[in-house]
Regions:
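Peripheral terminal appendages
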Residues: 1-42, 48, 52-56, 216-272
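Repeat-unit-sized solenoid/scaffold elements
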Residues: 60, 109-127, 175-188, 222-243
Length: 272
């Protein structure tokens, strides 16, 4: 199964960072041209994935602008706090590194809380903390698509292979996007790319956390997954990992397959 997963996610164990940066920027430039979109939008959390994805997006917009001087498109880097975020300074540091054409802060707190209150009024019970965490992620994507819709832009996703293999994202939340420039990269490769692009150690080494749970803020990805990124990256690079970790990862991959697919229909057989 390991070879199948590696092939399905398009992971390459060895990459040339400089060539890969150029390839991924060119990919975004080509897709902008193909779609006639007027820019790119990405939510910036301060984690390494959105930091690297954001910098690549800004580079792509600048390159497209050089080739098409009449083009009026931009890159919108969007901070999307739920009330007061404990890691707001990291998002600010990421924005300072990325230098997006437009730096926007759009507060999702009141909209998320309003939906939670409407949910309680309709169902007679409060949403669970886990459910509300996914609502936060989906509200952030609603906000990004609202900006993209206003300016005929594309929403950029920051999903990479270590998240894709585990399905560690909210379906139709942070898993929703028009273009995913980090696809096929391991977490280690994303960090290495960030270093090559000049991001600070603070941003590169930030402990990954979705930070969606109000009852357990800052819970790390690895704690929630029950797996380490070191083992996930090793597996995706074709290396052996402990049997228990391999079995858990492969079971998680199979269980989360629906997240990597379009909504299932009667003619689909992949789920059987």
């Amino acid at each position: 199964m390991q070879d199948h997963i590696i092939e399905a996610l398009g992971v390459q164990a060895d990459i040339d960072l400089d060539s890969e940066i150029v390839r991924r920027v060119n990919f975004m430039v080509d897709y902008l041209h193909h779609t006639r979109a007027n820019g790119l939008v990405l939510g910036i959390s301060g984690g390494v994935d959105s930091t690297v994805g954001g910098r690549l997006a800004q580079m792509a917009v600048e390159q497209y602008r050089r080739v098409n001087p009449d083009w009026t498109g931009k890159f919108w880097g969007v901070r999307l706090p739920y009330h007061i975020q404990g890691d707001a300074d990291d998002a600010t540091a990421a924005i300072e590194f990325i230098q997006p054409d437009e730096d926007i802060e759009l507060q999702i707190g009141s909209a998320t809380d309003a939906l939670g209150e409407a949910f309680t009024a309709a169902l007679g019970e409060e949403p669970t903390d886990y459910n509300l965490g996914n609502v936060k992620a989906r509200m952030r994507m609603v906000a990004q698509y609202a900006i993209a819709g206003q300016y005929n832009a594309l929403v950029v996703g920051s999903d990479q292979a270590a998240e894709s293999v585990t399905g560690f994202y909210t379906k139709f939340g942070d898993g929703a996007a028009d273009i995913v420039p980090l696809a096929g990269l391991t977490k280690t490769q994303v960090r290495d790319m960030g270093t090559r692009l000049g991001a600070s150690d603070r941003l590169i080494d930030k402990v990954p956390t979705a930070d969606l749970l109000s009852d357990n803020p800052g819970r790390t990805d690895e704690d929630e997954l029950g797996m380490t990124y070191a083992n996930i990256d090793a597996y995706l690079s074709g290396q052996p990992i402990p049997d228990e970790a391999r079995e858990k990862l492969e079971e998680t991959y199979q269980r989360s397959e629906h997240k990597r697919r379009l909504p299932v229909g009667p003619a689909d057989t992949w789920w059987e």
